[in-house]
């Protein structure tokens, strides 16, 4: 936990861009001069804030389907480590899980933004049911509308094998219902990822699954993808993706 915290904090120190904030001394701000005689507000200068707040939030979305049953304790522990590290760096983080049960896709918020000490609830994570990844991503996008920053990074833990017992209903282009698995599931998930990115959300994934599903992961997430071989590598892989985001914001 300490090593991950230091890595993220050091990356922020290297790439941070100080914000200009109102002050009683510094560089005169012509747009604020009127405030002194009118409002008796003498903060008409700008100074550099050497400790700016991170300009983005992080959402960690955990696949909570039955395929993760064998490693659910490790997933919870890794989510806890990541959330604690981000909180120590002042980055707002939300940790959620998703699964599909009896035709419903359930998004469960384990730890919300600004919930101090809420990291312990991540250990309530459990695995059950199916994984309709596309619908889960759409729901996550809706939740991001209330996020406390302008920029967002959504990281999904995935096996790149969307699978649900309920079929895809007919559409104008495809008049017959289809099973939600294989290429149909991959295409649906990729469509939702593209929609989120068009809306300004950065979407990345930590992939742990069968080698046969690597092409699926590449098709859905492109270059914003980190592959792990063991679930205890989840926090470190997500940390690398977050450091990439910090560098992107600084460019």
Q: At which residue positions do the language-model features occur?
A:
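Acidic, glycine-rich A-domain
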Residues: 1-251
């Amino acid at each position: 936990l300490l090593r991950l915290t230091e890595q993220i904090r050091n990356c922020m120190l290297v790439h941070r861009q100080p914000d200009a904030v109102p002050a009683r001394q510094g560089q005169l701000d012509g747009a604020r001069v009127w405030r002194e005689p009118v409002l008796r507000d003498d903060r008409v200068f700008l100074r550099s804030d050497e400790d700016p707040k991170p300009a983005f939030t992080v959402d960690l979305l955990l696949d909570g389907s039955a395929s993760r049953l064998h490693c659910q304790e490790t997933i919870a522990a890794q989510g806890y480590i990541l959330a604690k590290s981000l909180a120590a760096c002042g980055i707002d983080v939300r940790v959620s899980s998703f699964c599909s049960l009896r035709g419903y896709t359930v998004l469960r918020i384990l730890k919300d933004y600004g919930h101090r000490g809420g990291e312990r609830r991540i250990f309530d994570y459990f695995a059950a049911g199916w994984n309709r990844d596309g619908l889960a991503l759409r729901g996550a996008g809706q939740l991001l509308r209330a996020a406390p920053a302008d920029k967002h990074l959504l990281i999904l833990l995935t096996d790149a094998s969307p699978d649900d017992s309920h079929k895809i209903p007919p559409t104008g282009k495809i008049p017959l219902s289809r099973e939600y698995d294989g290429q149909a599931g991959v295409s649906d998930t990729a469509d939702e990822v593209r929609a989120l990115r068009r809306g300004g959300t950065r979407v990345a994934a930590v992939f742990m699954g069968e080698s046969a599903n690597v092409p699926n992961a590449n098709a859905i997430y492109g270059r914003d993808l980190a592959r792990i071989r063991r679930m205890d590598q989840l926090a470190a892989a997500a940390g690398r993706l977050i450091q990439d985001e910090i560098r992107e914001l600084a460019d």
